[in-house]
Amino acid sequence: MNHSSPTGSFRAVLLDLDGTLMDTIPDIAAAANAMRVDLGLSMLHVDIIRSFVGKGTDNLIMRALSHDLGSEMVTPDLFEKGRAAFYPHYHEVNGQHSVVYPGVREGLRLLMDRGLKLGVVTNKPTEFTLPLLRQAGLLQNMQAVVCGDTLPRRKPLPDPMLHACDMLNVAPTETVAIGDSINDALSARAAGCAVLAVPYGYNEGLDVQDLDVDAIVSDIEEAAQWIVSRLP
Protein backbone atom coordinates (compact mmCIF):
# COMPACT_ATOMS: atom_id res chain seq x y z
CA MET A 1 0.00 0.00 0.00
CA ASN A 2 0.96 3.67 0.10
CA HIS A 3 4.28 4.72 1.55
CA SER A 4 4.58 7.89 3.60
CA SER A 5 4.85 10.82 1.22
CA PRO A 6 8.47 11.59 0.32
CA THR A 7 9.78 15.11 0.50
CA GLY A 8 12.83 16.49 -1.21
CA SER A 9 14.21 18.33 -4.18
CA PHE A 10 12.38 16.74 -7.08
CA ARG A 11 13.94 17.76 -10.39
CA ALA A 12 12.20 15.53 -12.93
CA VAL A 13 8.89 13.84 -13.69
CA LEU A 14 8.54 10.71 -15.83
CA LEU A 15 5.11 9.98 -17.28
CA ASP A 16 3.58 6.89 -18.81
CA LEU A 17 1.74 7.40 -22.11
CA ASP A 18 -1.16 4.95 -22.61
CA GLY A 19 -3.72 5.38 -19.85
CA THR A 20 -1.81 8.24 -18.19
CA LEU A 21 -1.22 11.05 -20.67
CA MET A 22 -3.63 9.85 -23.34
CA ASP A 23 -6.59 7.54 -23.80
CA THR A 24 -5.33 5.45 -26.71
CA ILE A 25 -7.70 2.50 -26.37
CA PRO A 26 -9.98 3.41 -29.30
CA ASP A 27 -7.09 3.20 -31.76
CA ILE A 28 -5.47 0.16 -30.14
CA ALA A 29 -8.78 -1.71 -30.12
CA ALA A 30 -9.46 -0.83 -33.75
CA ALA A 31 -6.06 -2.16 -34.82
CA ALA A 32 -6.29 -5.29 -32.66
CA ASN A 33 -9.74 -6.13 -33.99
CA ALA A 34 -8.67 -5.49 -37.59
CA MET A 35 -5.81 -7.92 -36.98
CA ARG A 36 -8.20 -10.53 -35.60
CA VAL A 37 -10.55 -10.16 -38.56
CA ASP A 38 -7.60 -10.57 -40.94
CA LEU A 39 -6.83 -13.87 -39.21
CA GLY A 40 -10.42 -15.11 -39.26
CA LEU A 41 -11.21 -14.32 -35.63
CA SER A 42 -14.19 -12.40 -34.27
CA MET A 43 -13.88 -8.89 -32.88
CA LEU A 44 -13.43 -8.38 -29.13
CA HIS A 45 -15.16 -5.80 -26.96
CA VAL A 46 -13.04 -2.74 -26.29
CA ASP A 47 -13.09 -3.44 -22.53
CA ILE A 48 -11.42 -6.80 -23.11
CA ILE A 49 -8.69 -5.24 -25.23
CA ARG A 50 -8.22 -2.51 -22.60
CA SER A 51 -7.11 -5.20 -20.15
CA PHE A 52 -4.34 -6.27 -22.57
CA VAL A 53 -2.55 -2.89 -22.50
CA GLY A 54 0.53 -2.25 -20.38
CA LYS A 55 3.33 -4.66 -21.18
CA GLY A 56 4.08 -3.62 -24.74
CA THR A 57 2.78 -4.28 -28.22
CA ASP A 58 3.98 -7.87 -28.59
CA ASN A 59 2.25 -8.82 -25.34
CA LEU A 60 -0.91 -7.07 -26.55
CA ILE A 61 -0.82 -9.02 -29.81
CA MET A 62 -0.28 -12.32 -28.00
CA ARG A 63 -3.14 -11.67 -25.59
CA ALA A 64 -5.45 -10.54 -28.40
CA LEU A 65 -4.74 -13.79 -30.24
CA SER A 66 -4.80 -16.13 -27.25
CA HIS A 67 -7.95 -14.70 -25.65
CA ASP A 68 -10.19 -17.35 -27.20
CA LEU A 69 -7.63 -19.66 -28.78
CA GLY A 70 -5.53 -20.31 -25.69
CA SER A 71 -1.84 -19.44 -25.59
CA GLU A 72 -0.82 -22.97 -26.60
CA MET A 73 -2.62 -22.48 -29.92
CA VAL A 74 -0.72 -19.29 -30.79
CA THR A 75 2.18 -20.76 -32.75
CA PRO A 76 5.21 -18.63 -33.65
CA ASP A 77 3.88 -18.52 -37.21
CA LEU A 78 0.45 -17.27 -36.09
CA PHE A 79 2.04 -14.69 -33.82
CA GLU A 80 4.17 -13.35 -36.67
CA LYS A 81 1.09 -13.17 -38.89
CA GLY A 82 -0.66 -11.25 -36.14
CA ARG A 83 2.27 -8.89 -35.76
CA ALA A 84 2.47 -8.36 -39.52
CA ALA A 85 -1.24 -7.46 -39.52
CA PHE A 86 -1.35 -5.33 -36.36
CA TYR A 87 1.50 -2.94 -37.15
CA PRO A 88 0.14 -1.51 -40.42
CA HIS A 89 -3.38 -1.35 -38.98
CA TYR A 90 -2.12 0.58 -35.97
CA HIS A 91 -0.03 2.92 -38.10
CA GLU A 92 -3.19 3.68 -40.05
CA VAL A 93 -5.28 4.62 -37.00
CA ASN A 94 -2.63 5.78 -34.49
CA GLY A 95 -3.86 9.08 -33.05
CA GLN A 96 -7.16 9.18 -34.95
CA HIS A 97 -9.34 8.77 -31.88
CA SER A 98 -6.80 9.04 -29.05
CA VAL A 99 -7.30 12.00 -26.73
CA VAL A 100 -5.21 13.79 -24.12
CA TYR A 101 -6.78 13.30 -20.70
CA PRO A 102 -8.23 16.31 -18.85
CA GLY A 103 -5.68 17.93 -16.56
CA VAL A 104 -2.64 16.79 -18.54
CA ARG A 105 -1.78 20.06 -20.25
CA GLU A 106 -2.45 22.07 -17.10
CA GLY A 107 -0.30 19.73 -15.02
CA LEU A 108 2.60 19.74 -17.46
CA ARG A 109 2.50 23.55 -17.61
CA LEU A 110 2.67 23.79 -13.81
CA LEU A 111 5.62 21.40 -13.69
CA MET A 112 7.48 23.24 -16.44
CA ASP A 113 6.78 26.60 -14.81
CA ARG A 114 8.50 25.29 -11.68
CA GLY A 115 11.52 24.18 -13.71
CA LEU A 116 11.03 20.41 -13.56
CA LYS A 117 12.33 18.28 -16.41
CA LEU A 118 9.78 16.08 -18.14
CA GLY A 119 10.06 12.70 -19.82
CA VAL A 120 7.90 9.89 -21.14
CA VAL A 121 8.61 6.26 -20.26
CA THR A 122 6.37 3.89 -22.20
CA ASN A 123 6.33 0.28 -23.35
CA LYS A 124 4.91 1.45 -26.69
CA PRO A 125 7.31 1.08 -29.67
CA THR A 126 9.08 4.22 -30.85
CA GLU A 127 7.40 4.14 -34.26
CA PHE A 128 4.01 4.64 -32.60
CA THR A 129 5.07 6.79 -29.63
CA LEU A 130 6.77 9.72 -31.33
CA PRO A 131 4.07 10.40 -33.95
CA LEU A 132 1.37 10.18 -31.28
CA LEU A 133 3.12 12.58 -28.90
CA ARG A 134 3.89 14.95 -31.77
CA GLN A 135 0.30 14.93 -33.03
CA ALA A 136 -1.02 15.59 -29.52
CA GLY A 137 1.35 18.53 -29.06
CA LEU A 138 3.10 16.84 -26.13
CA LEU A 139 6.45 15.89 -27.67
CA GLN A 140 7.79 19.43 -27.52
CA ASN A 141 7.47 19.37 -23.72
CA MET A 142 9.51 16.20 -23.26
CA GLN A 143 13.27 16.24 -22.71
CA ALA A 144 13.48 12.44 -22.73
CA VAL A 145 11.38 9.74 -24.38
CA VAL A 146 12.09 6.09 -23.56
CA CYS A 147 10.03 3.59 -25.53
CA GLY A 148 9.42 -0.13 -25.41
CA ASP A 149 12.15 -0.81 -27.95
CA THR A 150 14.71 1.69 -26.63
CA LEU A 151 16.32 -0.89 -24.34
CA PRO A 152 16.41 -4.70 -24.21
CA ARG A 153 14.19 -4.67 -21.10
CA ARG A 154 10.93 -2.78 -20.54
CA LYS A 155 8.73 -1.91 -17.58
CA PRO A 156 8.03 -3.44 -15.05
CA LEU A 157 11.83 -3.71 -14.83
CA PRO A 158 13.66 -0.55 -13.70
CA ASP A 159 15.85 -0.12 -16.80
CA PRO A 160 13.64 2.40 -18.67
CA MET A 161 13.23 4.62 -15.61
CA LEU A 162 16.96 4.56 -14.92
CA HIS A 163 17.74 5.33 -18.55
CA ALA A 164 15.36 8.28 -18.53
CA CYS A 165 16.99 9.61 -15.36
CA ASP A 166 20.38 9.35 -17.06
CA MET A 167 19.05 11.22 -20.11
CA LEU A 168 17.76 14.01 -17.85
CA ASN A 169 20.90 13.99 -15.68
CA VAL A 170 18.93 13.47 -12.49
CA ALA A 171 19.07 10.86 -9.75
CA PRO A 172 16.11 8.49 -9.33
CA THR A 173 15.61 9.93 -5.84
CA GLU A 174 15.07 13.32 -7.50
CA THR A 175 12.43 11.88 -9.80
CA VAL A 176 8.69 11.25 -9.63
CA ALA A 177 7.13 8.66 -11.93
CA ILE A 178 3.44 8.92 -12.81
CA GLY A 179 1.51 6.02 -14.29
CA ASP A 180 -1.71 4.06 -14.30
CA SER A 181 -0.52 0.49 -13.89
CA ILE A 182 1.39 -2.06 -11.88
CA ASN A 183 4.10 -1.97 -14.56
CA ASP A 184 4.74 1.71 -13.85
CA ALA A 185 4.70 1.23 -10.08
CA LEU A 186 7.06 -1.76 -10.11
CA SER A 187 9.49 -0.12 -12.52
CA ALA A 188 9.62 3.15 -10.62
CA ARG A 189 9.93 1.50 -7.20
CA ALA A 190 12.77 -0.73 -8.43
CA ALA A 191 14.54 2.32 -9.86
CA GLY A 192 14.19 4.25 -6.60
CA CYS A 193 11.76 6.92 -7.83
CA ALA A 194 8.75 8.31 -6.03
CA VAL A 195 5.54 7.01 -7.62
CA LEU A 196 2.11 8.51 -8.23
CA ALA A 197 -0.81 6.69 -9.85
CA VAL A 198 -3.85 7.97 -11.71
CA PRO A 199 -7.08 5.95 -11.38
CA TYR A 200 -8.54 6.46 -14.85
CA GLY A 201 -6.12 4.31 -16.85
CA TYR A 202 -5.97 0.64 -17.76
CA ASN A 203 -3.83 -1.31 -15.23
CA GLU A 204 -4.67 -4.58 -17.00
CA GLY A 205 -8.11 -4.57 -15.37
CA LEU A 206 -6.73 -4.46 -11.82
CA ASP A 207 -7.66 -2.02 -9.05
CA VAL A 208 -5.24 0.91 -8.88
CA GLN A 209 -5.90 1.10 -5.12
CA ASP A 210 -3.77 -2.01 -4.68
CA LEU A 211 -0.64 -0.48 -6.22
CA ASP A 212 2.47 0.29 -4.16
CA VAL A 213 2.56 4.05 -4.73
CA ASP A 214 3.12 7.21 -2.71
CA ALA A 215 -0.27 8.64 -3.65
CA ILE A 216 -3.20 8.15 -5.98
CA VAL A 217 -4.05 11.43 -7.67
CA SER A 218 -7.16 12.24 -9.68
CA ASP A 219 -5.27 13.53 -12.72
CA ILE A 220 -1.94 14.96 -13.89
CA GLU A 221 -2.83 18.43 -12.64
CA GLU A 222 -3.30 17.08 -9.11
CA ALA A 223 -0.07 15.11 -9.52
CA ALA A 224 1.73 18.34 -10.41
CA GLN A 225 0.26 20.05 -7.35
CA TRP A 226 1.41 17.13 -5.18
CA ILE A 227 4.92 17.47 -6.57
CA VAL A 228 5.31 21.25 -6.40
CA SER A 229 3.93 21.32 -2.84
CA ARG A 230 6.97 19.27 -1.86
CA LEU A 231 9.56 21.45 -3.56
CA PRO A 232 11.82 23.57 -1.34
Show where each model-derived region lies:
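Asp-based, Mg2+/Mn2+-dependent phosphohydrolase catalytic module
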Residues: 1-12, 47, 112, 125-126, ...
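Active-site neighborhood of HAD-like aspartate-dependent phosphohydrolases
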Residues: 2-51
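Short, acidic loop-to-helix structural element flanking the phosphoryl-transfer center
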Residues: 8-9, 88-120, 126-130, 158
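A general structural signal for well-ordered alpha-helical segments in protein cores
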Residues: 28-29, 57-61, 79, 83, ...
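Short helix-capping segments at alpha-helix termini
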Residues: 37-42, 69-74, 113-114, 137-141, ...
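A metal-dependent, Asp-based hydrolase signature
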Residues: 55-92, 102-105, 110
